Design a protein with these regions (language model features):
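Short acidic alpha-helical/loop segments enriched in Asp/Glu that coordinate divalent cations
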Residues: 91, 116-118, 141
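Conserved protein kinase catalytic/activation segment
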Residues: 99-101
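Short, basic and Ser/Thr-rich N-terminal targeting/leader segments
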Residues: 9-11, 23-27, 86-88
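ATP-dependent carboxylate/phosphate-activation module, predominantly the ATP-grasp catalytic core
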Residues: 17-83, 107-132
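Peripheral (often C-terminal) accessory segments that flank ATP-dependent C-N-forming ligase machineries
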Residues: 130-215
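A short glycine-rich, hydrophobically flanked beta-strand micro-motif that places a catalytic Asp/Glu
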Residues: 15-17, 85-97
Length: 215
């Protein structure tokens, strides 16, 4: 902090407690609140791995959706109490020191890893169109079934996720067809050599990046 201020920074700083735990202690919650401030969709994700490159650190790379009624109800009540409308995306971390979840921030948008929401059956584009364009009264949709999403090769997930129970769950979901990758859209890949080559190189590169940066 002294070095920061001695180099010309003059404004206030917020000092935040470091919460211990690897990537799998992270959670991400995506919600949609309609034009009347009522929550109409919630999808909670248990983060398995994040990116570890200097530029990408903190971005979610693999997620399993999960249902936690207590946590999701608290956020629903908060959003409705402030009459929030639109997308909201919360970064949360489980603190093993007191067995509580700590909220880092609310993003007033969908997250970079939002395909974990769409691929698990919650098309957020449909929610906003039906709410804002067609003025429909939407039912509350809460994601309860587990679904495995990733934007990296599943072999990377299996290798670098430290919790064997989570790895086992990933493999079970994948075997059951309850998994998806952001780079697996068949219409993009079929007959498209350039796109297929890019995706293949991207995946190969992920093995190299995790080997170098994920310690």
């Amino acid at each position: 902090i002294e070095k920061i201020y001695s180099n010309g920074y003059e404004k206030s700083m917020i000092v935040q407690d470091y919460i211990p735990g690897d990537d799998s202690h992270m959670r991400v919650l995506t919600c949609y609140s309609d034009q009347n401030g009522k929550v109409k969709m919630q999808c909670l994700g248990h983060v398995l791995l994040e990116e570890h490159t200097p530029k990408g650190i903190g971005n979610h790379a693999a997620i399993i959706t999960e249902y936690d009624e207590e946590v999701m109800t608290k956020f629903k009540n908060f959003l409705e109490a402030i009459n929030y409308t639109g997308y909201s995306n919360f970064d949360i971390k489980y603190d093993a020191r007191d067995n509580k979840y700590k909220v880092f921030e609310i993003n007033l948008r969908q997250g970079r890893s939002n395909y974990y929401v769409t691929s698990s059956g919650n098309n957020i584009a449909k929610f906003v169109v039906e709410d804002r364009v067609y003025n429909k009264e939407l039912p509350l949709k809460i994601q309860k079934e587990p679904f495995f999403w990733r934007c990296i090769p599943k072999q990377v997930v299996y290798k670098y996720v430290k919790n064997p129970d989570l790895v086992k769950k990933c493999k079970e979901l994948d075997a059951a067809g309850k998994s998806a990758t952001s780079f697996g859209y068949k219409a993009d890949l079929k007959g498209n050599f350039k796109r297929s080559s890019y995706v293949s190189l991207y995946y190969i590169n992920q093995f190299r990046k995790f080997k170098k940066y994920c310690k």
